[in-house]
Amino acid sequence: MNNYKIYIAIICLLFAFGCSKKFEAEPLDRITGDLIFDPLDKNADYAKQFLNGTYLLLPDWYNRIDGSFLDAGTDDAVPSRIGTQAEFYRTGRISSTTLPDDVWSKNYLGIRRANLFLSKVDVVPTTAVLKTQFKAEARFLRAYFYFELVKRWGGVPLIGDKVYTINDDINVPRNTLDECYAYIVAELDAIKSSLLPYAITDGDWGRANIGAAMALKSRVLLYAASPLSNPTNNIQKWALAAQAAADVKALGYTLVTDWVANFNATKNTEFIFIKQNVLNTNIEINNGPIGYLQGLGLTSPSQNLVDAFLMLDGKAISDAGSTYDSNNPYLNRDPRLTATIMHNGKNWLGRPVETFEGGQDKPGGNRTQTRTGYYLRKFMGKFETSTTYTNQAHHVILLRYAEILLNHAEALNESGGAVADIVNNLVLIRKRAGILPGSNNLYGLSLTLSKDELRKIIQNERRIELAFEEHRTWDLRRWKLAEIELNKPVRGVQIIKNGTAYSYTYFNAANAVFDTKMYWYPIPQAEILANNKMVQNPGWPN
């Protein structure tokens, strides 16, 4: 293929990414047949590049909603800049025309690209083994894109392998929620053995493998079993979710010992599936405290989240017998607190963070700064004693083993599993975090906990272990707790320095409004207008 053809192929790909209507026929299918899917491309180089481009449509986390994390629309944080679109979620301002997290078109574009790949890759004269693997990867990506749609909107149109053309009828009804879950799971089951194995080479890192398919299945079945999707509490759904998580555990993934370094690794035993990024300092600059270098401090974690972190002995700060000291609130806490959140007095770039009133990181005035008394620390490199930021790996860790352990604990608890098995999953999480083992070697847990007690513990463990990894938004919805937790104010702390001592006053940093119709996103108005069979979600006007 000469340079001119390669150039045209690239233009075609860019055009595909720019298309905004998911069912409208794009000329992509007419111009890629002999350019990207080339009968002379014996190594499948261009087909692989097209597939790689489809991977780029996988989700991002970092500051993606108008400069904020999606979690800044929950009770875990607020955007430091007032009025950013992430606040629409907390204030109830989303609508079918105002949806900052509108990934409908993006995910249907991914589905279309996967279908186009499946329909054309057979003309490429590469090996049957490689074709089988690539087809399985395309189907995995398609399943992932469908789940991104389903967790937001519920049932969506399933279009199978069809690649729509200009002359096709694009009026397609929504499938039911259960049909969508069943389709995704069936696809993952069908292709898992054709994907790369559990152990993959460095050159294939970031590609879907059997672990990714099984881990995504675990997540999908957990959502399908949860109250939002399972209002009758069908225990069999929880049992299926428990088995799916157990199957992933059997593959051999393990937790890494260094919780902080985990998020700047390129490859390790905990990562199951990642979206790769180039080395950069974007997270540090966008979220670092404003008194350092170019720190923009765009994310303000909440007091609500700070209070969720345990004491070092594994007890909640509100537990009877807790050693929590209101005059020294960050002392003897779960190490994940200071690994997730910058609080006053934490060392960073060679000096203590100053979020007291008038401090270097909370100077007052009109400059964007923390609204809660906290800054984000998670995902950053170990710069506590450094003088400057250096490039770090900031891959998007889409699936990791810690989530699987939490999935297993939750599904076992809801399906009537043995308390010891449930607790063992949590012990692994807490032990790695640095919680003390205690006299019973159960890291603040016990084998006499009730189902309801374990449920609360598991939910809180997910909150702190997976903070800012885009789980809180969906967890609160699938548990049907959003109407409770997201109607509470998001709290912050005002710190006054008195000599060498500090006083702490807690306040409401932002109000919150959650209506039950917000459990499911409104379908974008443009999709309703374009498809006369598309039915809007309950409570939302067209």
Per-region residue spans from a language model:
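Conserved, well-structured interaction surfaces
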Residues: D41-N52, L56-W61, G83-W153, D169-A182, ...
